[in-house]
């Protein structure tokens, strides 16, 4: 696409690392680059439009600590391993939990932002002796699947479930909360 003489590059990277060299090459040629939703591993772009996922993780950590009253065990369903939101949300969450020695993450697994993968992970975990008081899912879709698996099982666990994004629409996090599913 560089040979076609583009005037502007707008990217919304799935993962941070793979697209970074291309963005740097385009930016170094004087072509403006706008990065949307997810960051990349360079500062060689013109503008970034998106949320502060580190702060989102910190806010989730604060809320988790309040729900658990400073003591409990957490299962974390992370997003795609190489994606900047998953990395930043995890880091922000951990930063807050450092101040709560009575709270620990007992398992942190990748759900890849995907309901089906989150369902598989939760189904596998439901048959283990692992216990947790709260599930922190990096997005609402994974949180909803965790909720569904727990309700469909005979598990005695009844953890708090936190999801992130709060998207609108029938299949968004806001509706999940309004329906009592989260």
At which residue positions do the language-model features occur?
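A residue-level marker of the well-folded mature domains of exported/periplasmic proteins
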Residues: 1-182
């Amino acid at each position: 696409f560089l040979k076609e003489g583009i005037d502007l590059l707008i990217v919304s990277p799935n993962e941070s690392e793979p697209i970074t060299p291309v963005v740097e090459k385009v930016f170094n040629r004087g072509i403006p680059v706008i990065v949307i939703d997810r960051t990349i591993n360079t500062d060689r772009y013109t503008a970034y439009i998106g949320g502060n996922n580190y702060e989102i993780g910190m806010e989730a950590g604060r809320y988790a600590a309040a729900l658990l009253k400073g003591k409990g065990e957490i299962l974390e369903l992370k997003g795609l391993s190489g994606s900047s939101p998953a990395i930043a949300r995890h880091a922000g969450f951990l930063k807050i939990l450092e101040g709560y020695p009575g709270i620990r993450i007992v398992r942190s697994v990748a759900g890849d932002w995907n309901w089906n993968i989150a369902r598989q992970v939760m189904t596998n975990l439901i048959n283990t002796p692992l216990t947790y008081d709260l599930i922190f899912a990096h997005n609402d879709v994974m949180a909803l699947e965790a909720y569904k698996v727990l309700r469909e099982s005979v598990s005695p666990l009844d953890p708090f479930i936190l999801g992130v994004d709060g998207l609108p629409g029938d299949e968004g996090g806001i509706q999940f909360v309004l329906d009592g599913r989260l």
